[in-house]
From Swiss-Prot:
One Pfam assignment: Aminotran_5
Modified-residue entries (N6-(pyridoxal phosphate)lysine), positions: 206
Keywords: 2Fe-2S, Cytoplasm, Iron, Iron-sulfur, Metal-binding, Pyridoxal phosphate, Transferase
Subunit and interaction comment: Homodimer. Forms a heterotetramer with IscU, interacts with other sulfur acceptors.
Function: Master enzyme that delivers sulfur to a number of partners involved in Fe-S cluster assembly, tRNA modification or cofactor biosynthesis. Catalyzes the removal of elemental sulfur atoms from cysteine to produce alanine. Functions as a sulfur delivery protein for Fe-S cluster synthesis onto IscU, an Fe-S scaffold assembly protein, as well as other S acceptor proteins.
Species name: Neisseria meningitidis serogroup B (strain ATCC BAA-335 / MC58)
Main location: cytoplasm
Active-site feature positions: 328
A single cellular component GO annotation: L-cysteine desulfurase complex
Pathway assigned in UniProt: Cofactor biosynthesis; iron-sulfur cluster biosynthesis
Cofactor section: pyridoxal 5'-phosphate
Protein name per UniProt: Cysteine desulfurase IscS
Length: 404
């Protein structure tokens, strides 16, 4: 089996741009280059038409109206605009916000910034499977709660939260519900009407589109108001000023159009690859899948290998492009805060690999990856005195390690 290495298995960080998307974008760089806001000539009109077509394609994927789509520079900006924008606008109603400990840093750090501004934030724990306990959420809601923010799909462990149930709870209590759907679009069906979502963050590049473009869905009925965070020419109905990058928007629109059309075949492809990988690593002892395997996107596997050190594992499988933790925080040597929130100990949190498949991943590549990991785990464990002690039946938790 000859497989071209390194094998790219880090699609949750970013996939390549789909060739069909790239082809659609190119004319808007050189030929149809007008500014969509130039309304006095055909260059501007053509660009605006392309932007509105993309807006409609993005809205269609999430069952929204195209007037509810606001373009941003990416999901990080969408999260900032949604959370800060709503918190500032509804300040007179209350100053309490609720989110989850396993959210993306773009949500957690935005919440921390609001805490510095005097808001109160409750960070919910998750269960061992990574899912939010709805009773815990209900108990956290107060009279002055104005916003709840929960991600649809977790970027590290791929678990899918019960967004419709949370939407129901929030709508009943007239609380604004924000969802970070960067990892959900194109992986699971997203319907903002059925799920009663008020604000939804989206990313272009996570769906085989270009980087540097995202969108925020802002509900019109019942209407949600936001305070703008970026001021200027009043673009995007005043929500987000700045010249619209037509080529990026066209790319994101085409990516979302393809994602809607090919969701079923992508899902079948991912499930097949996942089965091949899980079969390939069968028989390795002390392997833990992080996060619920049922309520999960089909292209994500986050696996901890006990008695193997994370950094040495990444180096041992250098023929694979995988990550431990998310790309946004993998430069840090701290164990993943998401895995810690599941109750994993430092050792298991440190020995995790996030393996994420994509549209372009082949069965041969996944087979190769599983076999490589299996052989390297064996070699690394041979070098581990802890593994030897574990195999000898010694309970490592009962040992008092001497401090030096």
């Amino acid at each position: 089996m000859t497989v071209k290495t390194p094998v790219y298995l880090d699609y949750a960080a970013t996939p390549p741009v789909d060739k069909r998307v790239a082809e659609k974008m190119i004319p808007y760089l050189t030929e149809t280059f007008g500014n969509p806001a130039s309304n006095s000539h055909s260059f501007g009109w053509e660009a605006e038409e392309a932007v509105e077509k993309a807006r409609a394609d993005i809205a269609a994927l999430i069952n929204a109206d195209s007037k509810e789509i606001v373009f941003t520079s990416g999901a990080t900006e969408s999260n900032n605009l949604a959370i800060k924008g709503a918190a500032h606008f509804y300040k007179s109603k209350g100053n309490h916000l609720i989110t989850v400990k396993t959210e993306h840093k773009a949500v957690l750090d935005t919440m921390r910034e609001l805490e510095r501004q005097g808001y109160e934030v409750t960070y919910l724990d998750v269960q061992e499977n990574g899912l939010v306990d709805l009773d815990v959420l209900k108990a956290a809601i107060r009279e002055d709660t104005i916003l709840v923010s929960v991600m649809w799909v977790n970027n590290e462990i791929g678990v899918v939260q019960d967004i419709p149930a949370i939407g129901e709870i929030c709508r009943e209590r007239k609380i604004i519900f924000h969802v970070d759907a960067a990892q959900a679009c194109g992986k699971v069906p997203v319907d903002v009407e059925a799920a009663k979502v008020d604000l939804l963050s989206m990313s272009g590049h996570k769906v085989y589109g270009p980087k540097g473009i995202g969108a925020l869905y802002v509900r019109r009925k019942p209407r949600v108001r936001l305070e703008a965070q970026m001021h200027g020419g009043g673009h995007e109905r005043g929500f987000r000023s700045g010249t619209l990058p037509t080529h990026q928007i066209v790319g994101m629109g085409e990516a979302f159009r393809i994602a809607k059309e090919e969701l079923a075949q992508d899902t079948a492809h991912y499930l097949k690859l996942r089965d091949i990988f899980l079969k390939g690593i069968e028989g390795i002892e002390e392997v833990y899948i992080n996060g619920d395997l049922e309520h999960r996107v089909p292209n994500n596997l986050n696996v901890s290998f006990n008695f193997v050190e994370g950094e040495s594992l990444i180096m041992a499988v250098k023929e694979l492009a995988v990550s431990s933790g998310s790309a946004c925080t993998s430069a840090s040597l701290e164990p993943s805060y998401v895995l810690r929130a599941l109750g994993r100990n430092d050792e298991l949190a440190h020995s995790s690999l996030r393996i994420t498949f994509g549209r372009m991943t082949t069965e041969e590549e996944v087979q190769f990856a599983a076999e490589l990991i299996k052989s390297k785990i064996g070699k690394l464990r041979e070098l581990s005195p802890l593994w030897e002690m574990f195999k000898d039946g010694i309970d490592l938790n009962s040992i008092e390690w001497a401090a030096h």
